[in-house]
Amino acid sequence: EPGVYVEGSHGIRHENEMVVRKGEKNEYGQFMYFETITFVPFDLDGLDVSLMTRYDIEWLNAYHAEVFAKVSPYLNEAEKEWLKHATRAI
């Protein structure tokens, strides 16, 4: 769970809600997978990209692309511009 904690002051945590779905079933058994059901961007200003792996960055960029694709159709132009900036690739 990503978060920022200011010692002796406060903390902020970002969490997504997920559901577990049945996936493929094969000779090894029933596989499950997670489906994200909340789509809110991470605050990019709160990230120290130097601590992130290539996988972390690729995951975040893909997640932000999905956030924009799912949420933007419900927004007016000013809100879309804000979301476009908030979900920009890093």
Model-derived regions, located:
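Charged, cofactor-coupling segments
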Residues: 1-90
